[in-house]
Amino acid sequence: MTLEELYLIEKDRIKKISLYYARIYYTEPEDLYQEGALAVIETYARYAELPDEELLKVSHRIINRKIYKYAKKEYRHKEYESNATEKD
């Protein structure tokens, strides 16, 4: 499987996950989508030698975790900023 094929398979999942976490953590879905696309590249660079089924399993897990971590980090950052402005 090539990187392009992996991306084409994963792009709809990335979009769904991005929209899901964007609603929960009040962040931009485009940013989350980009994080998911970068996760595909990183996954392929590291695990390209795996069989296709295994590569997809690993890819699903890594994409989900990367998007989740980014969304959670952004939410904390926004929460911290709003608390800082309230104290001023």
Regions found by a protein language model. Name each.
Residues 1-77:
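Alpha-helical promoter-recognition and RNA polymerase-docking modules of transcription initiation factors
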Residues 80-88:
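Internal acidic/polar
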